[in-house]
Amino acid sequence: MTKIGLIDYGMGNLFSVQQAFKRFNQPLDIISDIKTLQSCDALILPGVGAFDPAMMNLRKTELVPSIIDWVNNGKPLFGICLGLQLLFEASDEGTSEGLGVIKGHIRRLPQEKDERIPHIGWSPIYKTNECPILENYPGSNWMYFVHSYSACPLEPKHTVAVTKFGKTDVSSMVWHKNTGACQFHPEKSGVAGQKIIFNWINWLKKNKF
């Protein structure tokens, strides 16, 4: 069985993510140091909260160089919510440098008529590019969001799904090398979110990571 590590840096809802993967009989090992990280085949980077405190906490674990090497070497990583944002170079929300494994910036959601910030609730996502975790996926599906910022990848091909925020398309999923991430919470998005998780687990098994 693929050994998947769930990174614990004090800013992720670990229990709900573990429960979501448990539905597919996939255990997750809690990762908080380099030794346990190196024993894994794949990683999950969750996240709830603000960009700067998250990067500060992540640096305290001394895992940052290892995570950067992990992604750059093509090993699989799955980011969730704030975990997606940390993959980028920087954020409008703070002054800290992100992991920088995907080129681009995290921008505050635009002011749109009839839309509130933070964006909390259900919105459909629309596939814009192919990636393994969107294989055989319908044209759109509703996911659960809680965020005030969204990713703006330098290369548009890294956005694989968007959601409408007023009249603006904002990135809701990214893919680069073997790293994928969701701005929404797949673990809280019912059957549609479970499909994302299933596809990722299945992709790991097919590729024998």
From Swiss-Prot:
Q: Which residues form the active site?
A: 81, 185, 187
Q: What is its EC number?
A: 4.3.2.10, 3.5.1.2
Q: Which reaction does it catalyse?
A: 5-[(5-phospho-1-deoxy-D-ribulos-1-ylimino)methylamino]-1-(5-phospho-beta-D-ribosyl)imidazole-4-carboxamide + L-glutamine = D-erythro-1-(imidazol-4-yl)glycerol 3-phosphate + 5-amino-1-(5-phospho-beta-D-ribosyl)imidazole-4-carboxamide + L-glutamate + H(+); L-glutamine + H2O = L-glutamate + NH4(+)
Which cellular compartments is it found in? Cytoplasm
Read off the SUPFAM superfamilies from this record.
Class I glutamine amidotransferase-like
Q: In which pathway does it act?
A: Amino-acid biosynthesis; L-histidine biosynthesis; L-histidine from 5-phospho-alpha-D-ribose 1-diphosphate: step 5/9
Q: How is this protein annotated for GO cellular component?
A: cytoplasm
Q: For this chain's UniProt record, which GO biological process terms are given?
A: L-histidine biosynthetic process
- Recite the UniProt keywords alphabetically: Amino-acid biosynthesis, Cytoplasm, Glutamine amidotransferase, Histidine biosynthesis, Hydrolase, Lyase
* Gene Ontology molecular-function annotations: glutaminase activity; imidazoleglycerol-phosphate synthase activity; lyase activity
Q: Kindly give the PANTHER family that the UniProt entry links to this protein.
A: IMIDAZOLE GLYCEROL PHOSPHATE SYNTHASE SUBUNIT HISH
Question: What's this protein's name?
Answer: Imidazole glycerol phosphate synthase subunit HisH
Which organism is the protein's source? Prochlorococcus marinus (strain NATL2A)
